[in-house]
Amino acid sequence: MVYIIKYIQVNKKRGSKYMERKQAKDLLDFIYDSPTAFHAVETVKNILDENGFREIKESDKWHLKSRDKYYVIKNDSSIMAFIVGDEKIEETGLRLIGAHTDAPGFRVKPNPQMISEGKYVKLNTEMYGGPIISTWYDRPLALAGKVAIKGASPLKPETRLVNINKPMMIIPNIAIHMN
């Protein structure tokens, strides 16, 4: 939402057709840049930073000030942003807007590589979120997510976002005569 509001404010003087096209393009860019909830949080975080919001940690004691803008990230997959009003919440209330950023798909399991017949590699995956399986068959698929790599301590690996935005794999459908 902040993403779209930002461009409405900047471009509202240029006419509604321009605004509509710009908003549509910005939304598509956001979707392409955010193939997972982790990527969406990173994209929203960058937008919030550009618009004067400050990150606060869930575990810290909060010292909120009127009219200040804040956000909190949880598990790198959820983000909550808010602006503190200058009136008493008991009198004026509270307004919240929420969005869901994860989607059905397949998650790669730890120890993902499965060699089949010594000729090709299969990924060991699990379904997430109840996808409609038939829509995934016989189409090129990319790979995106969060990976853990060796860090300074074995107990604290570093994480990186990965988005290999090109066709890498396919889930083949069963032959028509076998279905």
Model-derived features: where do they sit?
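N-terminal hydrophobic/helix-forming segments and targeting peptides
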Residues: 2-179
